[in-house]
Structure formats: structure tokens, C-alpha cells
């Protein structure tokens, strides 16, 4: 097993919307082969952070750096920041400043994949087709942007086989091989959630961002989701960044937890460290920190 190292570094991130400060001076890291949970009350700024990382928003201030390949490429971060370009890619790996990149470039070049709070499958396509469409970019390159595909040349046929093999692997992983030819919209809700994650994994992401993947799931479906995310972490060594309100899921699978409240980080550590942090308890109870002990005793915590 390779040692964990930083894949994502968020440094002094601030996002303002006019006079509203949604995120203020936030810094944290996400590591290779670990699950990092971003938690906090509604309106704490969690989804805004995701939108900054994935290129939907351009942060007001701060740096969002992502690395893949050899961790030694981090040594070039200062030089990249001083330049005017968004990335540095070489034989040893890539280094990216996500705040300088368009959302499609973050996904394609920096290899950041994302799911949303609301399921966004292609409901009329089959389950298999949803996984194949996620591999559109390599298939288009192999097709020569049409000509190789039209004539069925060997390079394109090889890419097709590879795409189907990858899709089949993920169908097996999420237990949906027998539903491969069914419309994705016909699947039960929990299966749709897992299919959406499998589709994201078909892009071979360095960083997988999941926005409330357990929302609306029953206990059995939540357990299946947890097993899938642990498998992604342990077998594929993908860095997972997770927003979730289901604390049973968070505490079961997370290696690292960051807590936001009113756009600011109030805690950062392991599950045990965070759940015993007075700042976190105060935020959850909606009281000042000095009132935590009295209120916790009153409610039986």
C-alpha cells in the first residue's frame, strides 16, 4: 500500500457574493486513498466549497491546488502560482490550480469528478449507456473525432472494448449487471445513487466529490453506499471528498473530518477528535461554547 499524500490543498479560500461571505479563509487538505468528510449545519458553506473546487464558482480569494502522479510535483507549486498558467504536467504527474480553470477543464484535465444532491443520470439511457457516456472523451479521441469510428478501425475498436470492460467492472461492483439494459430511470432510488457514483468513477478521477450521497437512502441502502465508498478508497486509492448530513455514514467511513459553521472551519481532525470538540458540540446544539456543558447535561449527552 502506498503512503497517503496530499491530492488536494485548499488554502485560505474565501467566497463572497456581494456583501455575503459564504466561505471565509478556509484551509484543508484531502489525501490519496482517504475519505475526507466536509460537514456542518445547513448554510455552512459546504456546497459552495465544492462549487469552487469543481470550477462552478471562481473563488474571491485563495488557492485550490490538486496533484496527481508523483507527490514530488508539489515542489513546483510556488513556481506555478507565480506564473500565469493553470497547470504543470510532466512525466511524473500533474499539478493544477483549479481556481484558474473552467469547470470542464477541472473535470477533464485535473480529473475531478462530482455527483450532486439531486440525481443527474440520463434516465432514458440504459444503465450500461450511462457508464459508457462517462467515457466519451477517450472514445472520441480514439475515433479521431468520427473518422476512425465510422470505419471501425482497430484503435477505435480497442477503445470500445476497454470502455465496455470498465463499465462492466463497475456494474459488477455495484451489483447491477443484470440491470445493464434497463433504463436508468427504472432503477430504485438507492441503485440510482450507486450508479451515479459508478459513472463518476468511470472517468478515473483523482478526486471524487460527493454531495450528500446518502440523502434519501434507507438504512440498508446507506450500508451499501458505505461499502461502495470504502471499496473505492481501499481498492482504487481514490481521494474522496464527501458532504454528508448522515452522521452514521460519516463516522463509519471517514478518515478525516472538517466541520464548517457560517463559512468558517471550526474543527479539523479524526472522527473521534471532531465529535468531542466543544466547538462542534456548540454548533450542533446552537449554543455558545461556554454553555455546552450545561446544555449537554440537560439533554443527556
Language-model region placement:
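The feature captures the beta-strand-to-loop junction immediately N-terminal to the Walker
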Residues: 39-41
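Helix-to-loop junction immediately C-terminal to a conserved catalytic motif
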Residues: 54
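Conserved ABC ATPase "signature" region
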Residues: 143-179, 183, 206, 227-231
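Catalytic Walker B motif of ABC-type/P-loop ATPase nucleotide-binding domains
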Residues: 208-212
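Helical segment within the ABC ATPase nucleotide-binding domain
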Residues: 223-237
